[in-house]
Amino acid sequence: MLSMLMTTEYAPAEDRHELQQLLLHIAGGERDALAELYQRTRTAVYGLALSYLKNAQDAQDLTQDVYVQVWDCAEQYRPTGSPMGWLLTMCRNLCLMRMRREERHAALSEEEWDAIPTQECGLDADERALLQGALARLADEERRIVLLHAVTGMKHREIAALLELPLPTVLSKYHRALKKMRSFLEGDDA
């Protein structure tokens, strides 16, 4: 199970080009392109929003806000950048604005964990509970780094840019987080 977090089934070169094309079509006013972008990226956007807001309903609302902003700002995307990075930066910025406004720092409830889509990764209920327990032991920033790498397939360098952290810090926090999770999953920290 932990190996799923260490490697991803992600084809960044193909996805990057396809996402760039979708953004160009969105900038041209094509609603179908927005629907396709939403279908392909919503899990990653929602996961990042949930990691910041810690409330399933707020994360769903913010996810919708991200795609409204994509529709309004698609012409501002520059193809030299990562489309997923652009989208997740937009999500992060909206999350930070909402958190400043509402000053919310609560823990995820059981109901909110259930709202996280895990069907795509093939986890059964027991594995999901174990993973939840392991993730809950991490600091917020460590959890964000692990989820960004595991859910979105982002490279550590992209995560560092998104979170505005030095690459060595991201790598250190990622490996420390995996070590904590491994310890928990092996029963050393139960």
Give names to the regions the model predicted.
Residues R40-T43, S51-K54, R137, L147-M154:
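Short helix-capping/turn signature of helix-turn-helix
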